[in-house]
UniProtKB/Swiss-Prot annotation:
Role, per record: Catalyzes the complicated ring closure reaction between the two acyclic compounds 1-deoxy-D-xylulose-5-phosphate (DXP) and 3-amino-2-oxopropyl phosphate (1-amino-acetone-3-phosphate or AAP) to form pyridoxine 5'-phosphate (PNP) and inorganic phosphate.
InterPro entries per record: Aldolase_TIM (IPR013785), PyrdxlP_synth_PdxJ (IPR004569), Pyridoxine-5'_phos_synth (IPR036130)
Pfam families found in the cross-reference section: PdxJ
Family: Belongs to the PNP synthase family.
Record note on quaternary structure: Homooctamer; tetramer of dimers.
One GO CC term, this protein: cytosol
EC number: 2.6.99.2
UniProt GO BP: pyridoxine biosynthetic process
Protein name: Pyridoxine 5'-phosphate synthase
């Protein structure tokens, strides 16, 4: 049965908009866990635009499920990860001008640097995933990097303009799942997944964990975080 990792970055985004202490993403994580989330995902960006070091530290101390830390493959972030010891580190690309992560890592282009970061993290006893597009060459490069998992970037599927484009993107995801399996890589997925489209990806099978944030927090504004998480848990686990 697939797992749901709830990304709470946007709780921190709301807090940072006023520069205060509320809403606290640490409290949000506790509510998400009680509602059935299998893990909590956060992205500690280099510019600290939403999640702060304090959040990461407290979440590591309080989370009862699993903590997935999204991070750039920089010396600073590797050092932080080795100190905090999340249950999984997901390496993601990062641009200061972007509103959210816009695409997958180019593992082919940056293979040496990514391989080095993966090795350091694994030497520290950490499990490493790479956030990549559902592209054959990128998956093969991820395997060469020594990573344990890939997280398939589902943004192109989520943003498909029509049925035909959506089916093409679903096929890419399906092929990516199969190739990763043959290479011995675990498979997670995320980006742009919501209450309307998650069933289509879940029907493919082969994905261990879905990391979903924006749609859950958006619904939580209207119905509460507990209900929003429970509804997504039902879709992920029983679709």
């Amino acid at each position: 049965m697939a797992r749901l990792g709830v990304n709470i970055d946007h709780v921190a985004t709301i807090r940072q908009a006023r520069g205060g202490a509320e809403p606290d993403p640490v409290a949000a994580a506790a509510i998400a866990e009680l509602a059935g989330a299998d893990g909590i995902t956060i992205h500690l960006r280099e510019d600290r635009r939403h999640i702060q070091d304090r959040d990461l530290r407290l979440l590591r101390q309080t989370i009862k499920t699993r903590l997935n830390l999204e991070m750039a493959a920089t010396d600073e972030m590797v050092s932080i990860a080795l100190s905090v010891k999340p249950d999984m580190c997901t390496l993601v690309p990062e641009k200061r001008q972007e509103l959210t992560t816009e695409g997958g890592l180019d593992v082919r282009l940056h293979l040496d640097a990514i391989r080095g970061a993966v090795q350091k993290l694994q030497d520290g006893g950490l499990i490493v995933s790479l956030f990549i597009d559902p592209d054959t060459d990128q998956i093969k490069a991820a395997d060469k990097s020594g990573a344990d998992y890939i997280e398939i970037h589902t943004g192109a599927f989520a943003e498909a303009s029509d049925w035909k484009a959506e089916q093409e993107e679903l096929k890419k995801i399906e092929n990516a799942i199969k190739l990763a399996g043959k290479l011995g890589l675990g498979v997670n997925a995320g980006h742009g997944l919501n209450y309307s489209n998650i069933r289509k990806v879940a029907a493919l099978g082969g994905i261990e964990e879905y990391n979903i944030g924006h749609s859950i927090i958006s619904k939580a504004v209207l119905v509460g975080l507990d209900r929003a998480v429970r509804d997504m848990v039902d879709l992920v686990k029983y679709s």
